[in-house]
């Protein structure tokens, strides 16, 4: 199975999302899935990642070699983001069904409230004073929590402020990420599992 992840900023987000999605694929019984990130076209921000014209371009370019398309964006406290993703999923699924005979699918997910929170969910030694519900609700969770944690770990000078290092650690505790992120990770895993089960 070939999985292509579409991100609003692959430069910073790739190192976080790749290990977590790979761990998710193992959890749903697809350990051999080849998971890659779309780098061409390079999307700049959630507006482009949620634009049908951009998504259609990606589906046309990579549809022949991809079974599962997965767009991951920050929620940023925007309650309408899920509705936009739902609309994108419908358009993409219709496009894939009409263009290809083999089963292909497209899912979208918005991280509450930023992708960095998925990483924090799997990390050990998060300051005990931090309340998880507050981390999940914070619109600027990247600056309010993730960057502070990366600084505590002396990772701000590392590539992408330590996102990759921390994500690799977090992915080893994927069960914890799933448990702490029911609105996004748990939901996405359930959708992927159901789709894989239908394939047989």
Locations of regions flagged by a protein language model:
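C-terminal accessory helical subdomains adjacent to catalytic cores in phosphodiester-
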Residues: 1-3, 12-42, 49-200
